[in-house]
């Protein structure tokens, strides 16, 4: 399977995928820093892990997916890419002695703070954490939001405020696609 085929499958099945500008930004970060390893939170069907694996610097990707159905499909779609290791687990239970150059958080938006707190210990000293979809623009043009949508928007806004106020971190919010946050330890 090639990347375009997987992208088509994701779109046809309404599976969210990393947007092109965000992917380009992350590839620039990888290239500029010579990063070789990625921890991804939120595999879905594996589109972003597949895309990252095409970067020649990347030697190892561990991607975590909580949903068993998505995990099974990702295993099938990515089975030929040896540098990708897929884990079926809620990220808060993930443990490893391995450290990663880049951590890409694209999991449940209502649990971003918990995911960030848990995953930061897996980051190399000069590593970067990237959080995707900080703006949730899909809700911007809706006249009425459900109570759950309002709660989700509030949680994401709280996470953004929490993240920017973190001691010991340089945090940059980039207004591309649906918003990307770049976090690097000071």
Task: Name these PLM-found stretches.
Residues 1-102, 109-130, 134-186:
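A short alpha-helical cap/connector motif
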